[in-house]
Amino acid sequence: MRIDAFLPALTVSPATFISRAFEGVGVSDLDFESVEFNRKWDVRCVDERFAWLFCDASMIDTILELGDGVTVETFGNYILFTRDLVGDAAALLRFLEHVTQVPAHLNPLVREEYPTVAAMESRGMIDEWSQRPDGR
């Protein structure tokens, strides 16, 4: 799903035995207010502040509703959702309905704090312009 903000890399993935083993040796994920969420998912992000903005109570509830086995990632101006396609068509349709509601649950501060696509394109053009030889 494309949104109009460039986001830091974040991964919300199902907790596994291996991820719990890493936590046991000090490579921990981020924990939030929801005990159920912390038990079921690992959150890793290069920008902890962004992770807290993204994983607010509304988004945590949305991710919990998506069901077990779902991974949510942010990449540039995309929010990506992956899950196994095993299951009936009705379950897949419910999943897609929940995913389409994600923009409504996205914390408004995320859009305010992180640059828009137009701003990033503008920065790129300014950088290209400033690197011309002799400023011409």
Task: Spell out what each predicted region is.
Residues 1-136:
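Charged, low-complexity intrinsically disordered regions
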